[in-house]
Every structure is written in structure tokens, then in C-alpha cells.
């Protein structure tokens, strides 16, 4: 495909923006490409600056579960825009979205809106530390919880893509409180908490690990987290920024029936607008200022445009049959890709949960970050470039999930699988 305009725009952007992008994974370094510059999108399709049309499986990295420019979401935004963008004061939209979130997510009775997933996780950890009076934090290798200093330890997502073990500028004194354990390893968790439980404020986890390429929790892993954190007086935080309202209407905690103490949300609840949230029981959330003394604030938190988009999105997702259709289509894609690879003799591991999909170029099961990193990254890069040439827009990283939306049709899925058949044959 001709990408002359995108390349020219990237060259211009690189003079003004570090790396030419405002989030590192977009740069495409891991797959040997320069980034596409997007002109517009509609439904499940996205159009670049050169006019090339692609079937989109990035979905703005997860938020666009209804597809691009969904009529109900656009109408809600347009209505709010006529009244103003942001007021620095409360609107009824904040409580309306909060009610929808609380009704859907088992762990949430009260919720605080913020502007990003990173804000949500860093605020949730501060809350846990403030409540427990402890500093220790346990996370899991390959789980990415945003770019807050204490969380950039053995992280996934763009950190894994860039092969950066952490980041310069993160003080050693900050990360000394962070312990990172293997995902899906209950023995390691139990041993850690048995030794250091009285120092640990919280355990944070992606219940479905989308930021290492989409790895599902082993049976019993999440229940072990719940049991061990309760035993040692630690708070359990589910980072459902990615999985919330995507693997089920109530998130992974509803799907797996494990209730954490605090839940972090983002992406889908903003309908494509910048948003984040964290919530829990009234007993926990009463500690947040101004009701309590644990401080967190944000100028644009709860802004009306994001709230309106979120309300419209969740209203659509509540309709009967939505998640059944999403899951069926995601499974159709996963099964089709797996069959196409097998027919070509290309070893892959395909995982599907709800409307998320992971495809690893690996010859053995992927259950944690160590096994995810055995993937053939050069083969993935070749696959990515060839699929892009065939009009399939995937995340430019082996360690990112594939997102399916309600706008994807069986025809989109079949065209994607047919493209993959041709690509696998040449890998």
C-alpha cells in the first residue's frame, strides 16, 4: 500500500514530538515500520492519511468496543458539546455514569472518575497504602498498570515492546517497595505473602493479562489472590482498565466471580474519550478526600464529554445479546487464525476471552510473561507487516491484545482469516 503521506507526516512529527509519537508503542519500532497517520474511521474500519482502508483491531487500544463513530455515542457527545466542554464543576452526567458502573461491577459501591488508567492505578495504590499504613506493593511480571514510577517494574505493554526493563528516572527508593512475581504462580504469591505479608499494602493484577499479549488466568489463580490477600490483611486491586466491560459487562471479576477490594477502570467507560476510574466499597472509598484524608484530584476529572460518551457506550452494551455476539465473533477469529496457522505449519497459541484475543508466535502454551517472551518476535514482525499490506490493522507489538468490536461483522472476520492464510503460507 502507498503510505507516502503517512511517512511524510511522521517525518514532520519526529522533529516536534519525541520519537514522532505520543505513546511509544505507536512508533512501530518492534515491527520495523513507521506509524500510520489516521484520517478518519467508521465502524470496524479505519482510513489512513493516504486513503488506505484497514479493518481495525486496535480500536484505540481497547475503548472502541462499539466501533468508531457509533451513532448513539456521537449523538450523546454532540448534545453535550452544545452546552460546553468542561466547567470545573459537577454535572449530573458524573453521577449517572457512576451509577451505571456501580450497578455493573461487583466490587464497586462508590467510584471516583479520573482521566487515565495510570491515574486510576496510582490513586488506587495510594488509597491502599493510606488505609493499611503499609508501603509494600506486589504486582506480576508482564502486567502493565500505567507509567507511574512504582509500577515500571517488569511491566508489559509498550515497556515490553521497547525491551526496556524499567525506565531511567525511576528512583531506586521508589521501586524498592515493589515486588514483581510470575503471573499465574500461586506458590510464588503464597511464599511472598507468608514472608512479607505484614509489609504489603496491596496486590495489583490484570485479572486478564492483556498487556502481555492477552493471557487468561489459570483456574484457581484469582481465587488464590483473594484468599491470600485476605489472610494477610492486604487489599486486592483488579486493574480492569482493559478487561472492564470488555470480557463481560461486569468485567473479569463478574466473569470469574472473584471480588477484589478496589477496581481500576478506563478505556471502554469513556467511549473513546480520555477517562479512568477507581472504585470499591463505601468503607474503602470514604477515605478519599474530601470525605477522607487520602488526597487525589484532577482538573478535568468527570468532564462532561467523556461522561456522556461513557453513558452512551454502557447503555448500548447493556442490551441483550451484545456480549454473546462479541464473544462468538472473537472466537470465530481466534479459531480461524489458529487453523490458518496450523495448515501452514506455523506454531501459534491463540487465546480468546470475551472480546479480547491474543495470538502468540510460540510453540508451547503461554501462561505467563516468561512463556510469552518465547514468542518468535521476528516472525510476528513479518506477519504484522504483511497483514498491514493486506488491509488488516493490528497492534505493532506481540505483547498487545487484539480487540473485536460490535461493528466487526462475519465478513470482516472472514476477510481477516483469509488474509492470514496467505500471510502464514509465506512466513
From Swiss-Prot:
Record organism: Desulfosudis oleivorans (strain DSM 6200 / JCM 39069 / Hxd3) (Desulfococcus oleovorans)
Enzyme Commission numbers on file: 5.4.3.8
Record GO cellular component, one term: cytoplasm
Enzymatic class: isomerase
CDD domains per the UniProt record, alphabetical: OAT_like (cd00610)
UniProt name for this protein: Glutamate-1-semialdehyde 2,1-aminomutase
Pathway stated in the Swiss-Prot or TrEMBL entry: Porphyrin-containing compound metabolism; protoporphyrin-IX biosynthesis; 5-aminolevulinate from L-glutamyl-tRNA(Glu): step 2/2
Needed co-factor(s): pyridoxal 5'-phosphate
Pfam family, one: Aminotran_3
Subunit structure: Homodimer.
Domain of life: Bacteria
